[in-house]
A protein has these predicted regions:
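Contiguous alpha-helical segments
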Residues: 1-31
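Glycine-rich short-loop/terminal segments
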Residues: 28-116, 180-207
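Short, surface-exposed loop and linker segments with low hydrophobicity and enrichment for Pro/Ser/Thr
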Residues: 68-75, 139-147
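Residue-level detector of short, conserved catalytic/binding motifs and their immediate flanks
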Residues: 77-79, 120, 147
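Short, flexible beta-strand-to-coil junctions
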Residues: 82-86, 125-127, 143-144, 151-157
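Short active-site-adjacent helix-start/loop capping segments
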Residues: 89-90, 130-132, 159
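Short HxH-centered metal-ligating active-site micro-motif
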Residues: 95-145
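Divalent-metal-activated hydrolytic enzyme cores
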Residues: 144-207
Length: 207
């Protein structure tokens, strides 16, 4: 009887998981308007063991970014670069509902190219309920200055990926190539596979 119940419960749980995944996929990409409540509940995060002062600086930036997106960019995507070693912060860069191009912003691009390795954090919001994009991963991997990248969703949730001292660009690039091949070109699936293996090549993630 216990085995029967276990099998039934397992099937029920798996069905619930499939339904939840299907709902997430259905809702993915639909813009969520930013509310004051979402801004207030942005959590304190400390990527790569950041101290409290740095974590507070990151939290305040995430809140300011959402407020800027809410009031000045129709809840669309906005990005901002921080220098975690100096406490400097660049102006917000506006995007649209699906993307923001920090490389097209002169000041941001200059930082990406000239700041010391592992000194910069790139923060941006996602209007929909999506995760890191392929372009996010490209920018994160290819610019030595970028140590951490964060997504703060329009509902106030924060995800981060950070390079550790063991970051291996060649291994990470090879891992992404394998993930793309394994996923038959499905970018979302490739990113999921890639990030599941991220600790192998020196990337720390939090969610």
């Amino acid at each position: 009887m216990r085995r029967v119940n276990y099998a039934a419960n397992r099937d029920r749980i798996n069905a619930q998981k499939r339904a939840a995944y299907a709902l997430r996929q259905k809702n993915r990409g639909k813009k969520v308007s930013i509310t004051d409540i979402a801004i207030q509940k942005v959590p304190l995060v400390a990527p790569n063991g950041a101290d409290h002062q740095t974590a507070f600086f990151i939290q305040e930036t995430h809140k300011e970014l959402l407020r800027f997106a809410q009031t000045q960019n129709n809840s669309n995507e906005v990005a901002c670069l921080l220098d975690l070693t100096t406490g400097e912060k660049l102006d917000f860069v506006k995007g649209d509902q699906v993307s923001v191009d920090v490389e097209a912003d002169a000041a941001s691009y200059h930082w990406l190219r000239t700041r010391p390795p592992n000194s910069v954090m790139l923060c941006h919001n996602y209007p929909g309920q999506s995760y890191f994009s392929m372009n996010d991963i490209f920018v994160f991997m290819h610019y030595d200055a970028v140590r951490t990248m964060s997504i703060v969703t329009n509902q106030g949730k924060v995800w981060t990926i950070s390079k550790t001292a063991e970051f291996d660009f060649a291994a990470a690039k090879e891992s992404m190539s394998r993930a793309i091949a394994k996923s038959s070109g499905n970018k979302d699936r490739a990113i999921e596979i890639f990030l599941k293996e991220c600790y192998n090549y020196g990337v720390e993630r939090s969610e």
